[in-house]
A protein has these predicted regions:
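Flavin-dependent oxidoreductase catalytic core characteristic
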Residues: 1-279
């Protein structure tokens, strides 16, 4: 009945579905071909899943209130359900640190995403190289990006595949267009910062987080569509509602991340931190 709690429950349900969808989707890539390179997909699933898993447990603690701090044994001794939220917090929080901390995972994904572009455009932006080397690299890069970059500005009016379940065609179109917007923003950042981009860890993190959100949306559409196709969706209407709600939440996050790429306080925060440390 209370809107504040209801919104938390809806978000928790949607994100729980998305976490499982990402795991299933990533695993299916290996099932299709054992030689598939899923480093980026697996890293995104780990990064996004552990972050959202912690958010879910944190919201659970907020909902449970003081009872969340009690052990299951203490709750049961008082005649209440033994929900071990305090244990969930201990077990879940460490996941954002072990097997690749959140910060390391973001840098790894960013490096993998940038590597193909840096191989092409890196020499052009590297002022330490001889002029003739940079000019030759510029000609090669121009030929590559003359076709690639303009396509990023073409809006897509279709979902891109007839395999996308009909209820999710609109969400699929948004994912395609946001993916191209992400590629444009990342390319612009490369041109602006050049080789120094790898030092902009927080900026790169925003690109990675946006990509992870889009991957989560894609996984949700794929898994939900498969469940509907096989008749294993159970309450299909609720499944569609859950997926659409998740995509709305995720799209809002992507929009905010794109805004922060252009408007942020990163430089001021970095300078302040240096002064605090030196003091």
């Amino acid at each position: 009945k209370h809107d504040a709690i209801a919104q938390k429950l809806a978000k928790m349900a949607a994100q729980t579905f998305a976490i499982e969808a990402m795991v299933r989707y990533t695993s299916s890539l290996v099932d299709l071909d054992k030689k598939n390179d899923i480093r980026i997909e697996a890293a995104m699933a780990k990064l996004w899943g552990t972050e959202r898993g912690w958010d879910i447990v944190d919201d659970t603690m907020q909902i449970r209130g003081g009872r969340g701090y009690e052990t299951a044994q203490s709750l049961e001794a008082r005649g209440e359900p033994g929900i071990p939220v305090e244990r969930m917090m201990r077990d879940c929080r460490i996941n954002t640190i072990f097997e690749g901390s959140t910060e390391i995972m973001r840098l790894f994904i960013a490096r993998e995403a940038l590597d193909p572009h840096l191989k092409i455009g890196g020499p052009v932006l590297n002022t330490t190289l001889p002029t003739e080397v940079r000019l030759k690299a510029a000609v090669q890069a121009a030929g590559r990006y003359a076709l690639w970059y303009p396509r990023l500005w073409i809006p897509f009016l279709t979902c891109g595949s007839d395999d996308v379940a009909r209820p999710f065609r609109r969400e699929a179109r948004r994912i395609r267009n946001d993916s191209r917007r992400l590629a444009r923003r990342l390319f612009h950042a490369m041109l602006r910062h050049g080789p120094k981009l790898d030092k902009k860890q927080v900026l790169l993190g925003r690109f990675v987080d946006a990509g992870a959100e889009l991957y989560a949306q894609t996984a949700c559409l794929a898994w939900a569509g498969e469940l509907i196709k096989k008749g294993e969706a159970g309450d299909a209407a609720r499944l569609v509602e859950t997926v659409k709600h998740f995509c709305q939440l995720s799209q809002a996050t992507v929009k905010e991340l794109f805004r922060e790429v252009g408007r942020n306080s990163d430089s001021g925060g970095y300078q302040l931190a240096r002064k605090l440390i030196h003091d």
